[in-house]
């Protein structure tokens, strides 16, 4: 199951945000063998050669193409789901897809008990602590699926250190209460971020990846890629701002945040 972006493919226009993001990444990653050999780099560089950036659902379909029985996509916006269906039809080979035009939190929670333990959930919202009309959040989806033994990968973002601290507390307390102590959580944050003011907006100033029930190899790769991204962005600029990053890891055993300037 996957929450989705509005579109499958984004047309690139060399905006400052895109220059700081995908263009900078592809240029710098080309010099690093691990990043250059990553599937993300290979798929995006191929698509970017035609001036297009692959969105989250498109990547999911291409990355998991040969390894799964089907995709389930949830979105409140019908247009987003129609875009997914169109993209799927244009692929030479793709597993069956099913779309659900409903609230993705309640929609996924409803079908979770009927899904196999081998299910992989990619949860890609913006606000993971925002309650829906029934009082449920995206983190509730992750904890419920994790307790059923399913693999989960959740993305979250923040614009200030205050927001980050609120989310860190929310995540660690929610997981602890659910009895989930084994997880991987890695954040990449612009050094330009401030405590309670937004000084610039390249799209997001800090983002985190929270993974549960993944293999030790996958958990290790999240940390490896995090360190690699910090390294290649060490001299980056976004407009007149410092574009360098630091990596913060939320410990999976003690629920203690460790700030690491790598």
Name each model feature, range by range.
Residues 156-162, 189-192:
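Short beta-alpha junction loops
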Residues 6-102, 106-116, 126-130, 137-144:
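Class I S-adenosyl-L-methionine-dependent methyltransferase module
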């Amino acid at each position: 199951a996957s929450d989705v972006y509005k579109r499958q493919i984004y047309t690139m226009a060399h905006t400052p945000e895109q220059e700081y993001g995908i263009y900078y990444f592809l240029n710098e990653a080309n010099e690093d063998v691990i990043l250059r050999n990553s599937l993300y780099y290979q798929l995006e560089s191929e698509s970017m050669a035609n001036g297009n950036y692959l969105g989250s659902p498109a990547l999911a379909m291409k990355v998991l193409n040969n390894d799964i029985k089907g995709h389930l996509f949830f979105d409140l916006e019908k247009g987003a789901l129609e875009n997914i269906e169109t993209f799927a039809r244009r692929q030479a080979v793709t597993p069956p897809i099913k779309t659900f035009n409903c609230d993705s939190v309640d929609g996924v929670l409803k079908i979770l008990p009927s899904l196999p333990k081998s299910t992989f959930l990619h949860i890609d919202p913006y606000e993971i602590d925002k309650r829906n009309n029934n009082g449920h959040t995206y983190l509730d989806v992750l904890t419920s699926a994790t307790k059923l033994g399913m693999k989960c990968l959740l993305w979250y973002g923040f614009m200030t250190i205050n927001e980050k601290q609120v989310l860190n507390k929310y995540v660690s307390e929610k997981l602890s209460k659910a009895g989930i102590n084994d997880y991987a959580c890695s954040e990449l944050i612009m050094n330009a971020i401030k405590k309670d003011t937004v000084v610039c907006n390249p799209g997001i100033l800090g983002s985190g990846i929270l993974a549960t029930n993944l293999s030790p190899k996958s958990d290790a790769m999240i940390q490896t890629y995090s360190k690699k991204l910090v390294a290649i962005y060490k001299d980056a600029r976004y407009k007149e701002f410092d574009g360098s990053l630091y990596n913060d890891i939320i410990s999976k055993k003690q629920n203690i945040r460790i700030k690491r300037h790598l």
